[in-house]
Structures are given as C-alpha cells and as structure tokens.
C-alpha cells in the first residue's frame, strides 16, 4: 500500500510539473522586417503598418495577449528565433524545406508568387534574358536561393541586400537592372509608389525553388505555440476578420490558398 501511495504521489507531482511547465503567454513577440510594403512597413509617424502587421495584431487580439513587434533584417529572423529574441516571425516568410529543417511554421497566412521587377519595356522574363545584367535580392529570402542556384549559373550578376528598401535604392538609381522578389509586394507596394512609376513586373516565375506559401516562423519544437497560433489564425477566418483585413489591403484579391 505504501508503495502504491508513493507511486500515486509521484504521478501527481509529475502531472503538476506538466501543468506548471505549460507556458501561459501574456505577450507574443513577433520579428518583422518593415521594408516590405504593403505587408510590413513604417508609416510617416514611425508606426508599423501593413497586411502582416494587421494579421499579427488581430491574432493577438483573438488570443487575448499583447503583441510586441521586434524589428530585424530578414536575414536575422531565424537566428533571432533560435536566440529567443522573439517568439515568432511574421514578415512574409515563405515555407521552404530548408527552413523547415531549422524552424517550425504555423498554418498558412497567405500565398504569393515571385517575379522580376525592371524598367518598363526592358522585357526581362527568363534567366537567359538577364545574362550580363545585374539583379538584386533581399538576403535570407527564397529569392536568394533562386538567384544563387539559377541566375548566377545563367551569367547574371546578382547582389544581396540587407533589406528590400536597399534593393529599390540601387534599382531606381540604375545600379541594378532588375530585382527578383515577391510579386505582390512589387505590384501593390513599389509599383504604386512614386519611385516605382516607371517600372513593371514579369509574369510569375515557375520554379521549385520559389514556393508561395507563407506562415509564422516558430522555434523548432514549440508545439504549444504552434497550436496557439493556429487557433488564432483559424479564428480570424471563422469570424470574418481575415477577410476584412485582406479587403482593406488588397480589395477583392484573394491571397489565401487554404493549403
């Protein structure tokens, strides 16, 4: 009997420890690179704005936790997650096999293709058409992997930048012939700005290195946070909040694939 009581006591202690170890989030820290309008950027007053920002704040509201945004260059997102600088990454991060080896992801936030951006009339459409030209990309993105694996081998001079704003500076100054980047960001952000008035995008690039699904990046093995974020994302769809935010930024365009 004494042995049985000890066993039960040990079980109770283990259960209590399990409850205590379950983290109760009162605040969620999201890493963001605010150089990617209309998904994430800064307003004139310095506040963060964009589709991702609104989604992140809405997820926090659904989960009844405080949102804290931590700015970082995109290349520092995964190292930042591993170093616990933030709990998740909401910054147009595409889900790729390579990234899935390093971190986990929530369910889908949205999907979007990749394209080239260049001066109107240049007509770039393939790696071959860019031979001898210079193309910029943001470090740490799926476009970097494509540039190194495909464009470099096609005789294209590629250059990495810490953020998308720096890419645009060199593109508009003539130091770059084109950029390779998220198509929606280009069409709905850069091309609608005064600086992008004389530019256009190519058709979407069809390549296995350029998947389209984006999600919230999470530290590897944090299944509890993944379940919490998935719950918040589902709630946004169920109560119509996602549709409202999407319409605010993109009108009738649907970015959600449901995959």
Label each PLM-derived region with a short phrase:
Residues 53-62, 124, 128-129, 134, ...:
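Extended ligand-binding regions for polar small-molecule ligands
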Residues 22-92, 239:
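Extracytoplasmic small-molecule ligand-binding "clamshell" domains
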Residues 76, 91-101, 146-150, 177-210:
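A ligand-binding cleft/hinge motif common to bilobed small-molecule-binding domains
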Residues 65-68, 93-97, 106-156:
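A conserved helix-loop-strand patch within extracytoplasmic ligand-binding domains
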Residues 42, 56-65, 143-162, 190-197:
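Ligand-binding cleft/hinge of the Venus flytrap
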Residues 34, 110-118, 191-230, 252-259:
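Periplasmic-binding protein-like
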Residues 58-62, 70-71, 75-87, 102-104, ...:
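Short helices/loops that flank or line small-molecule/ion binding pockets
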Residues 16-22:
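Sec/Tat signal peptide C-region and signal peptidase I cleavage site
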